Amino acid sequence: MIIRLEEPKDYREVENLTREAFWNVYRPGCTEHYVLNQYRTNPDFIPELDFVMERQRVGDGTSGIIDGRIIGHVMFSKAEIALDSPHSQGGDGGGSFPSWTFGPISIHPDYKRKGYGLKLLNYALIKAKEMGIGLLQMEGNIGFYKHAGFDLASKLNIHYHDMPKDEDVPFFLAQELIPGYWSNREGTYCPPKGYFVADENPEAFEAYEATFPQKEKLRLPGQLGYEE
């Protein structure tokens, strides 16, 4: 496998990959491919951290021959944290503090649980740190993301919007890529608006979704809001 920056020629393939990776995972169907489609023109999008993982097969033993199939993708976004001024000792006096997030991160279903997602993420985190990105927060499964250095965001005094500040939020994770970047601060995070584009523009999303092959939407155990 090789990891490289996404190119315009990859867009449709990557969106289809994202759709396959998230279909019926968190809800019947998915919207992550539309989020990605719209995010590329969002000022919060970070093109230098827009990576694809491309399949490679062995050629004559001296060089690899790329067959062109993309099996993984991850994108990053600028974000911010609203500072809780009474508890922030960094001299900020309230306001907001720059941070970053990432996602969707997608691995084709045929390649899941084989280590490719962690390999892609770790590569991207190294590049993010090289760019000076000091803090990441995101929503995800700590069972997976702990292997890339993430822990509960509450341990860094970062709270999730609309959730009680005195409770740990098991899906809200964070990591300081640059030690001390977030020292002596406390604040509340709300995901960037770009992640809600499908909810805010349902007709546009449905028109976009109609350009893909039809797939069955299923209500399954483990999805958000699932009830027996």
Regions found by a protein language model. Give the residues of each.
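Hydrophobic adenine-recognition pocket in adenosine-nucleotide-binding enzymes
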Residues: E6, I105-I107, N141
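Conserved acetyl-CoA pyrophosphate-binding loop and the N-cap/start of the following alpha-helix
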Residues: F102, D110-Y111, G115-Y123, I133
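Active-site rim helix/loop that mediates acceptor-substrate recognition in acyltransferases
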Residues: E15-I66, H73-M75, E80
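Glycine-biased, low-complexity coil/linker segments
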Residues: Q89-G91
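Acidic/histidine-enriched, glycine/proline-rich intrinsically disordered or flexible terminal extensions
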Residues: P179-E228
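A short beta-loop-alpha structural element at the N-terminal edge
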Residues: I2-V14
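Conserved active-site alpha-helix within GNAT-family acetyltransferase domains
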Residues: E130-I133, G140-K165
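Glycine-rich phosphate/pyrophosphate-binding loop shared by adenosine-nucleotide-utilizing enzymes
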Residues: M1, D67-H73, W100
